[in-house]
Amino acid sequence: MDLQQLVLRSDELGVRLEVVNGLAIWEAQPLYRHQKHVERIAASIGRLEGGNCDCVHALDVYIQFPNGLKRPDISIFCREPGEAEQDSVLTMVPEAVVEVVSKGYEAKDLEIGPPFYLSQGVKDVLVFDPQTLLVLHVCQGQARRLVSPVVVDLKCRCSVVV
């Protein structure tokens, strides 16, 4: 069974599979409250004045990175994926990702995810913990701790309210 078949099978079983630098991470599917936070944040994504990025977002889709397979809660791209790629695991690297922390998976989202994403070419990583209202904004050489609600301007000239 190849990785794409394993991913599809894991969805049928109600779990998410992610691979980070060779380490397989299994996670339960997100719950209602989690998804409401994701939808609220996604609805706030917009283009900053003077930006040329289309600020296209995708929710909960698999992305094949050079060193792993992740399924960010929100991925932000400057353009739509190509037509051929829209029916399979995406391979284009997002400009930014947003993760909403699920209870019990704090380490995955706060400690494992940000350095992995940055190492794969993602420019901005936002992690929101709804329990504490912490918003962690990580980019190359910088990590900021903010408190929700907050407007964050991304390097790609998009903005998002977390």
Segments predicted by a language model, with ranges:
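Gly/Pro/Ser/Thr-rich low-complexity, intrinsically disordered segments predominantly at protein N-termini
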Residues: 1-162
